[in-house]
């Protein structure tokens, strides 16, 4: 508990009495409950859904995990949208969160959602916001694919996967993906199946501004934040109740939020909301036909 408190209070965390600690935990739990009820009438360009496994407080269901949603506003600012808990890989848990956001004002579907491929988040998103595009995290997908390969093959395969998501345009990415399939299908069909299963969702970023690709190909921008939160909160598992635990996690995420950097070229977000279509990272009206690109 001391480690987590030090992030929030600094040196003042040392030597706090049990009574003061109890009051702080109660205040944070109350602040979290109030935050969860706030109106949220914003337009979101991006929505990042992540679930973080931890050891729940004593007496809680061991399948419980922390569910977090980060958003990118029309101004290009990253902000904390939702913090809750729910069952691992549960569509119902995520759907409850998304329905709650709708009820509090997030009626317009976000333009794109980003996450790994193992969550009930996607099934819930299909029901709550069917218009929202979907982008699978390349870091998580790469790790899952490499797990199906012998260690001796992993370095070469990782480089081949990187050629896909680093391709300058969708056509080149599709070609690189086809090469990977041809090279690994016969010996490692499970690895190839994991890649092809989310083929469209892995390449969705090509329909967004090129300046945003670094933000939307993976969930990396927020991973370090939650690695710290998970580490700190896991070590408090025997010290707090569920409400105190959520309050503590919420306060730590709020603290981290102050250091988040907005996305590059935020003016392109306004273009997206204005209905401008992007092809291979460039506005469609500025994109050359395929034959002219080849000639160039």
Swiss-Prot record:
<keyword id="KW-0233">DNA recombination</keyword>
<comment type="similarity">
    <text>Belongs to the transposase mutator family.</text>
</comment>
<dbReference type="GO" id="GO:0006313">
    <property type="term" value="P:DNA transposition"/>
</dbReference>
<keyword id="KW-0238">DNA-binding</keyword>
<dbReference type="Pfam" id="PF00872">
    <property type="entry name" value="Transposase_mut"/>
</dbReference>
<dbReference type="GO" id="GO:0004803">
    <property type="term" value="F:transposase activity"/>
</dbReference>
<dbReference type="GO" id="GO:0003677">
    <property type="term" value="F:DNA binding"/>
</dbReference>
<keyword id="KW-0815">Transposition</keyword>
<comment type="function">
    <text>Required for the transposition of the insertion element.</text>
</comment>
<dbReference type="InterPro" id="IPR001207">
    <property type="entry name" value="Transposase_mutator"/>
</dbReference>
<keyword id="KW-0814">Transposable element</keyword>
<protein>
    <recommendedName>
        <fullName>Transposase for insertion sequence element IST2</fullName>
    </recommendedName>
</protein>
